[in-house]
Amino acid sequence: MKKKLAFLTVLMFGLSLGLMACVTTSVKPTTANLKNPVIPLESMEVPQYDGYWYYSKGTKTVKGDPGDRGAFLPMSFLFSVQNPNPYPVLLEGIMFTVSFDEDFDVVTINNQDSYWIPAGKTTHVRTTTMITVRSALLSLLVTGGFKLKAKGWTSWDTLERWWKGVPDLTVPVKVKEGAFNFIASDIERVVAFEAQVK
């Protein structure tokens, strides 16, 4: 009986060492073996819609201060970040620009949240931003005026079309100049990104 107990103890100890050796021989991140994560844009939605409206500072208000104010247009982008590596990677920041009608940049998003993506897994990352009629108007007048003129569009007609068309995806929305910053151990990599909302 003592021989069996000693044999089982030695066998269990040997199996434990063997299994621990398998666990600790994982692949370490190197510049050569770090594969770029894959980043498809899953969806874009307008989580709250209050229509299209604008009033100037000359408008008499019932409550509150008069001013140049317009409707809000929140936009929420859902990305699937797929990690093809045999080790976890850290998504340390996201930056991208949102444009309407291909040519008109309306906002640049800079999200500094951190997300761990496990080895061989996919993590969903949501980034939300918001523009107003006023901010979009200023962008159109300052940086998009010549483009508007070339297309024969007016700023107010364009804004109304955007506010009514972006929520139901009848206005082209593009995510461009994207940069996703990944870290694996002490290796840092920026992955470029661009996508058309469908």
Specify the residue positions occupied by each region the protein language model found.
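Sec-dependent bacterial lipoprotein signal peptides
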Residues: 1-22
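Bacterial Sec signal peptide processing site at the extreme N-terminus
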Residues: 17-39
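Post-signal peptide N-terminal segment of mature Sec-exported envelope proteins
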Residues: 31-55
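Short, solvent-exposed beta-strand/turn "edge" segments of beta-rich domains on protein surfaces
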Residues: 48-74, 82-89, 116-118
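Short, solvent-exposed loop/turn segments enriched in Ser/Thr/Gly
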Residues: 71-77, 170, 174
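Short acidic, flexible loop segments centered on an aromatic residue
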Residues: 82, 86-105
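Intrinsically disordered, low-complexity Pro/Gly/Ser/Thr-rich segments with frequent PxxP/GP/PP motifs
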Residues: 101-147
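Terminal connector regions
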Residues: 133-198
